Amino acid sequence: MCCWQSRGLLVKRVLAIILGGGAGTRLYPLTKLRAKPAVPLAGKYRLIDIPVSNCINSEIVKIYVLTQFNSASLNRHISRAYNFSGFQEGFVEVLAAQQTKDNPDWFQGTADAVRQYLWLFREWDVDEYLILSGDHLYRMDYAQFVKRHRETNADITLSVVPVDDRKAPELGLMKIDAQGRITDFSEKPQGEALRAMQVDTSVLGLSAEKAKLNPYIASMGIYVFKKEVLHNLLEKYEGATDFGKEIIPDSASDHNLQAYLFDDYWEDIGTIEAFYEANLALTKQPSPDFSFYNEKAPIYTRGRYLPPTKMLNSTVTESMIGEGCMIKQCRIHHSVLGIRSRIESDCTIEDTLVMGNDFYESSSERDTLKARGEIAAGIGSGTTIRRAIIDKNARIGKNVMIVNKENVQEANREELGFYIRNGIVVVIKNVTIADGTVI
C-alpha cells in the first residue's frame, strides 16, 4: 500500500484555495453589502460553509479564501466559525484583492486571483493545490479527488459531472479518451458543435444506462494542480486571467489532464434564480436532492446559541425554519425562514426565502418604533409574500403585498428597496417597505 493511501497522509500535503468570485453581479442585490461567499444559505449557513465544510470533512485544513469586494462580513464569519486549535496547523484565512504598485487592478479572473497571491502559496511545502469555487452546492470527498489525481499521475485533474442534452449547451464541455485523459474543450456549444462533444461517460464509471442518458461531461470549476505545474502555467500564460477558459484548455496539448467523475448532486447557485431554486429545493419531501441532515459529512457554520423557534397558532407546511424565530398566527408554505425571523399575525408566506435578522428588537424598542410611526424588523401583520427573497434585517410593514402581480421578469427599483430577477422579487438588506405597499 502506498503511504498516501492512508487518508490523513493523502491530503496532508494539499493546500485548498477557494475562489470567492468577483463583484457578484449575477447575485446582485444579495451582494450589494457583502462578498458573494458570505451570502446566507438555507436559513443559517453561508455559501462559503459548503466548500470549507467539504475540506474539513476531507481532512484538508489549510484553506485560503480569495475574495474581491465587501469582505468585512465574510472575515467576521470565518473568524468566528473556523477558529482551529493552536495545536494543529489548520486554518481558514480570507485574502482580499489588493491594489499595489505591481498589481494596480482588482482580480481579473480566477487565474489572476491565484497569480496575485502566488508569492504566499509558494511558501507552503505542499504537493498539490486544490482550487475550489465558492458558489456551488454539493457534498464531496476531496480526498478521493486527490487520490485519482495521483493515481493517474495527472498534471491537472478536473472534477466533472455527467450531463444530458438539455443542460449541456449551457456548460463548458470536454472530451476524453479511453483512459480518461481530457483531449478537447468547448464552451457552451450549440448544434453540430454540441453533438461533436458527446463521449462515452461509462469510461469514468457510469453505468451503461446512465451513460446513455448523460452523453456529455461538464467542468465543475474544481481542479487539482501539481504545485510546480500551476506555478509554471501562471508564468507561461501571464496574460491569461481564467483557468477554465484559457489556461486549462491551452495546456491540454502538452500536459496530462485527467477527468474525475462526480456523480452526485451539484448545483451552481451563482445566479438569483439558481440560488432561489436551490434554497427552496431543500424543502422537498420526503428527501431533498441535497440534505444538510448528514451526520457523516456535516456542513459547519458559526455557533450562535439562539433559543428555539416559537410558533403560535400557525400553519407551516413543506418549509425549513431557522433557530430563534417568532411566528404568530400565520400561514407558511414551501418556504425557508432564516435565523431570528419575525412574522406577525395573519401573514401568508409562500415560495419564499426569508433570510432573517442579525439582531433582536425588544418589546420596548418595537413599541418606541411604533410610537414614532416607524416599522420594526420583520414582516408586519396582514402581509402576503409569494415567490420572493427577503434579505436580512428588512422591515416590512403591515398589509404589504409582495406578489409581483404584473408578472414582471426584470426590474431595478433600488430606490424603492427591491429588484426583480427572473420574476423573483428580491427585497434588499436593511430596507424598509411601508405599510400597504404593493409590489
UniProtKB/Swiss-Prot annotation:
GO terms for molecular function: ATP binding; glucose-1-phosphate adenylyltransferase activity; structural constituent of carboxysome shell. Signal peptide: none annotated. Alpha-D-glucose 1-phosphate binds at residues 172, 187-188, 219. It holds the Pfam family LbH_GLGC. InterPro entries: ADP-Glc_PPase, ADP_Glu_pyroP_CS, GlgC_bac, NTP_transferase_dom, Nucleotide-diphossugar_trans, Trimer_LpxA-like_sf. One of its GO terms (cellular component) is carboxysome. One of its GO terms (biological process) is glycogen biosynthetic process. Keywords: ATP-binding, Carbohydrate metabolism, Glycogen biosynthesis, Glycogen metabolism, Nucleotide-binding, Nucleotidyltransferase, Transferase. The keyword Plastid does not apply. The keyword Transferase applies. PROSITE patterns: ADP_GLC_PYROPHOSPH_1, ADP_GLC_PYROPHOSPH_2, ADP_GLC_PYROPHOSPH_3. It comes from the Bacteria. Its EC number is 2.7.7.27. Pathway: Glycan biosynthesis; glycogen biosynthesis. Homotetramer. NCBIfam families: glgC, PRK02862.1. PANTHER family: GLUCOSE-1-PHOSPHATE ADENYLYLTRANSFERASE LARGE SUBUNIT 1, CHLOROPLASTIC-RELATED, GLUCOSE-1-PHOSPHATE ADENYLYLTRANSFERASE-RELATED. Belongs to the bacterial/plant glucose-1-phosphate adenylyltransferase family. This is Glucose-1-phosphate adenylyltransferase. It comes from Synechocystis sp. (strain ATCC 27184 / PCC 6803 / Kazusa). The lineage of its organism: Bacteria, Bacillati, Cyanobacteriota, Cyanophyceae, Synechococcales. The gene is glgC.
